[in-house]
Swiss-Prot record:
SUPFAM superfamilies: Concanavalin A-like lectins/glucanases (SSF49899). It catalyses: Endohydrolysis of (1->4)-beta-D-xylosidic linkages in xylans. One of its GO terms (cellular component) is extracellular region. GO terms for biological process: xylan catabolic process. Pfam families: Glyco_hydro_11. Transmembrane segments: none annotated. Keywords: Carbohydrate metabolism, Disulfide bond, Glycosidase, Hydrolase, Polysaccharide degradation, Secreted, Signal, Xylan degradation. This is Endo-1,4-beta-xylanase A. It comes from Aspergillus niger. It is found in: Secreted. Endo-1,4-beta-xylanase involved in the hydrolysis of xylan, a major structural heterogeneous polysaccharide found in plant biomass representing the second most abundant polysaccharide in the biosphere, after cellulose.
């Protein structure tokens, strides 16, 4: 979840050489997981079979929410999505989001965000180039915080796109391979979703996941 406020839910200047673009291996959408943490803080609707979801939230959001669609078991395969996302003045992310079981880790590939860049307050790991843009990469450690196994200590990994966008293909493997140089397990995946998260301000998102 967010780096600076109280963690909630189950659910970062060295430079790295660009990662060569691999051949994209797309998954069939095959969506089988709905992420709905505190979706009641806004208007969350979804169509799992169509791979679409929407979230609208207003000023006065009292806590953190994470909503989206994806898969019960994550992977390094590419994800293609399109979205309409408006979060100006809101602390919010549009991101590929998920967890690794061991070593336990929470991760984000942030495609667009509102008024808060998580790498502004975390430990920099450098940059990685993927899908037409440089991504800032950073990490943080969460100590005795809620997680997929209850209360635990785990690592967060973030890749934050500099040239933000709201549609495209995310070559997940590029990020996983870079993070793996810094302790990311790159296996034993828990769920993985295309998600919207926010914890302040107002905004809206409509997202379609095609692969």
């Amino acid at each position: 979840m967010k780096v600076t406020a109280a963690f909630a839910g189950l659910l970062v200047t060295a430079f790295a050489a660009p990662v060569p673009e691999p051949v994209l291996v797309s998954r069939s959408a095959g969506i089988n997981y709905v992420q709905n943490y505190n979706g009641n803080l806004g208007d969350f609707t979804y169509d799992e079979s169509a791979g679409t979801f929407s979230m609208y939230w207003e000023d006065g959001v009292s806590s953190d929410f994470v909503v989206g669609l994806g898969w019960t078991t994550g992977s390094s395969k590419a994800i293609t999505y399109s979205a309409e996302y408006s979060a100006s003045g809101s602390s919010s992310y549009l991101a590929v989001y998920g967890w690794v079981n061991y070593p336990q880790a929470e991760y984000y590939i942030v495609e667009d965000y509102g008024d808060y860049n998580p790498c502004s307050s975390a430990t920099s790991l450098g940059t990685v180039y993927s899908d037409g843009s440089t991504y800032q990469v950073c990490t943080d450690t969460r100590t005795n915080e809620p997680s997929i196994t209850g209360t635990s200590t785990f690592t967060q990994y973030f890749s934050v796109r500099e040239s933000t966008r709201t549609s495209g293909t995310v070559t997940v493997a590029n990020h996983f391979n870079f993070w793996a140089q810094h302790g990311f397990g790159n296996s034993d995946f828990n769920y993985q979703v295309m998600a919207v998260e926010a914890w302040s301000g107002a905004g809206s998102a409509s997202v379609t996941i095609s692969s």
